[in-house]
């Protein structure tokens, strides 16, 4: 008996001595030696907990048989035997069950987390907060599988992926006729429990970021973003130097339409986060086309930063506004998905989940529908196999989740594992997503500024500048004031208009902004604005914008612009300026600036005259000092089939010598001109397209120098329509 007691005592001393050895090994970075030492301390609960925690980090998610996971579970089981009042031991044991690949292990997670929470009640601080957070996350994941539940009507039994892959009208019909929203609000009890645990966690640790993040998302899910805003305000007060806290603040501000403040908060977050975390948050990779993702990975950090700057400069909805609403939305989505769908156990961010990827690109869906597990045909072909045992049957009862986007007609199908909100694309929707990335790399339709943005019709025309090496740019813009002012009360409204030119690096070259007061009086009212710029040859980005105060409506036009040079030793033409009317101010006109021009947006009603004006440079004089050249105008129908239309010259020239039809869809006019030699030759005329049907027409103006034999051509498109001429 004495020998047995002595041996037992010696064993206890030996195992207890292993923890300091494990601590020393861990301090020098030798985790293998630390695990071995901790596992040998079989009578030390703390050592067993440390062993379980280290082993759990070595588990590879998705492995069916994992030695690391088995040993981790054994260590945590021993820790709970030795110290049943240890919350850390029970929490670790719950995590090993959650990581398991079988449903029977995972359905025990709730019970183990409840036990961990019971013993953590008297243990304030980080451990108690971690336990409460994990318990809340478990409840949240249960809710994820039951949120937005739809019920099948009596005559419908399954949701076929073929329905979702069909015509958009079939998808709409399915949701209108075959299913209905569950009025019982399933999952609300899990949501209540999750909120209760999260608030308990914050009482234990007010700056526990995972808890604050999930609670922010949860409050948003319940339409309580103002409460979330108050929560994040308290968070940044208590942790003013936390980038994660400011990121959550930015999310809540953006979702309560405080976009300017959200931009400031998110920029503050990026300045405070560790460099790697900041780079991940602002990364463009989640919104790139697949072919561009590899190139992104090969860029240096400096090159990525510059590309991000250029990307967001191009994406900014309005240059008249200092707030980049799309960039704010991108960052807010990144914060949202990371807290909603993150998987701490698998060390997976929310952006790496299937739903997270879709959300990053396309934002919140217009329809979010989940269906009862096992009701999705062709996703679970073995679900009805009678030889499957109960656990395997449960494993196949995945939850189908459908997301629909109205404006883009995108649709996605996900499949969620039972008792565990790990999602995958259902059926062949991974391929659907891949194709969608090429068509729509990213969309921001959830922003009213983007979704309701109207169009400014703009005509740009280039002419040779007065200074060598420069060109004049005429900008003729048509603001759809009537549409922008729809629903506005009577009275003057403030209108801001602007033409902004940027260089290839998106730095301002010219910015011309005008503020006025307008009185809308009909739905088709148009405000015209004209700008003229003198620019050297090069690549530019042109934006014309209009914002109407009082109703918060906006319109814009964006153009990539290649300013040409006009050498003096060759035959060249300016752009062809299309107008409703054009006439010289007097008989001594020398350039396009000497004309009265009533510009057009390129839209004409059937039978309306089309005025054309252009300049020709480099005509060669003959021995008498005169220039002689031929002008040919060709009108071609591009979008409709038109049989036998005719054109006639209304004014501007008196020496037309030819008119010919070329097939059923083209008509040509030809005439000759002669004049005294000048640096530039201005030509103008008005043409009526008799009986022209509605459609898109291309006008080709060709000038042939009869002295040198050289030829030059410019094209312009016009649309003939009976609809609103501003559209």
Enumerate the language-model features and the residues they cover.
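Structural marker of alpha-solenoid helical repeat scaffolds
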Residues: 44, 82, 119-123, 204, ...
């Amino acid at each position: 008996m004495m020998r047995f007691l002595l041996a037992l005592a010696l064993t206890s001393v030996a195992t207890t001595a292993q923890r300091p050895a494990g601590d020393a090994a861990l301090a020098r970075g030798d985790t293998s030696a630390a695990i071995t030492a901790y596992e040998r301390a079989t009578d030390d609960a703390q050592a067993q907990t440390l062993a379980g925690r280290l082993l759990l980090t070595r588990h590879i998610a998705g492995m069916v048989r994992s030695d690391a996971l088995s040993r981790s579970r054994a260590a945590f089981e021993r820790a709970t035997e030795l110290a049943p009042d240890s919350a850390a031991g029970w929490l670790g044991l719950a995590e090993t069950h959650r990581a398991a690949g079988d449903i029977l292990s995972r359905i025990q997670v709730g019970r183990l987390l409840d036990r961990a929470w019971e013993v953590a009640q008297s243990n304030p601080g980080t451990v108690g907060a971690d336990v409460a957070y994990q318990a809340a996350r478990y409840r949240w994941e249960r809710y994820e599988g039951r949120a937005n539940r739809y019920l099948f009507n009596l005559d419908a039994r399954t949701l076929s992926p073929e329905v979702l892959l069909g015509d958009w009208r079939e998808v709409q019909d399915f949701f209108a006729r075959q299913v209905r929203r569950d009025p019982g609000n399933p999952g609300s009890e899990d949501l209540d429990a999750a909120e209760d645990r999260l608030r308990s966690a914050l009482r234990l640790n007010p700056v526990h970021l995972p808890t604050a993040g999930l609670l922010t998302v949860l409050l948003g899910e319940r339409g309580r973003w103002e409460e979330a805003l108050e929560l994040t305000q308290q968070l940044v007060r208590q942790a003013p130097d936390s980038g994660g806290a400011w990121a959550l603040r930015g999310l809540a501000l953006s979702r309560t339409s405080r976009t300017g403040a959200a931009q400031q908060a998110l920029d503050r977050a990026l300045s405070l986060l560790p460099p790697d975390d900041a780079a991940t948050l602002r990364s463009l990779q989640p919104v790139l086309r697949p072919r561009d993702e590899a190139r992104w990975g090969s860029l240096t950090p400096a090159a990525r930063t510059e590309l991000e700057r250029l990307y967001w400069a191009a994406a900014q909805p309005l240059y008249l506004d200092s707030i980049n609403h799309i960039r704010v939305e991108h960052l807010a989505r990144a914060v949202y998905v990371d807290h909603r769908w993150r998987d701490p156990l698998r060390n997976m961010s929310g952006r790496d989940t299937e739903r997270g990827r879709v959300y990053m690109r396309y934002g919140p869906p217009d329809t979010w529908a989940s269906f009862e597990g096992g009701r999705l045909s062709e996703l679970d072909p073995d679900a009805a196999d009678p030889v499957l045992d109960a656990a395997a049957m449960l494993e196949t009862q995945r939850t189908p989740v459908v997301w629909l986007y109205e404006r883009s007609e995108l649709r996605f199908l996900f499949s969620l594992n039972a008792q565990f909100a790990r999602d995958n694309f259902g059926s062949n929707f991974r391929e659907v997503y891949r194709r969608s990335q090429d068509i729509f790399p990213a969309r921001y339709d959830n922003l009213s500024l983007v979704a309701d943005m109207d169009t400014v019709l703009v005509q740009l025309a280039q002419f040779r500048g007065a200074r060598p090496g420069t060109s004049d740019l005429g900008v003729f813009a048509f603001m759809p004031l009537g549409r922008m002012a729809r629903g506005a009360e009577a009275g003057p409204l403030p209108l801001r208009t602007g033409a902004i030119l940027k260089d290839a690096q998106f730095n301002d070259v010219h910015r011309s902004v005008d503020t006025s007061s307008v009185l809308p009086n009909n739905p088709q009212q148009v405000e015209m604005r004209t700008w003229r710029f003198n620019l050297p040859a090069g690549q530019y980005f042109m934006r014309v914008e209009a914002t109407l105060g009082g109703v918060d409506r906006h319109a814009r036009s964006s153009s990539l612009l290649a300013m040409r040079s006009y050498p003096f030793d060759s035959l060249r033409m300016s752009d062809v300026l299309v107008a409703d009317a054009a006439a010289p101010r007097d008989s001594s006109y020398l350039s396009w600036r000497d004309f009265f021009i009533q510009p057009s947006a390129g839209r004409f009603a059937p039978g309306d005259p089309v005025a054309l004006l252009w300049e020709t440079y480099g005509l060669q004089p003959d021995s008498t000092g005169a220039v002689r050249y031929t002008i040919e105008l060709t009108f071609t129908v591009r979008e409709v089939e038109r049989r036998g239309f005719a054109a006639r010259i209304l004014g501007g020239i008196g020496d037309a010598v030819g008119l010919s039809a070329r097939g059923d869809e083209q008509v040509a006019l030809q005439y000759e001109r002669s004049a005294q030699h000048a640096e530039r030759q201005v030509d103008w005329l008005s043409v009526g397209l008799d009986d022209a049907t509605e459609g898109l027409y291309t006008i080709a103006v060709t000038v042939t120098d009869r002295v040198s034999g050289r030829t030059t051509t410019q094209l312009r498109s016009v649309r003939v329509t009976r609809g609103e001429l501003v559209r």
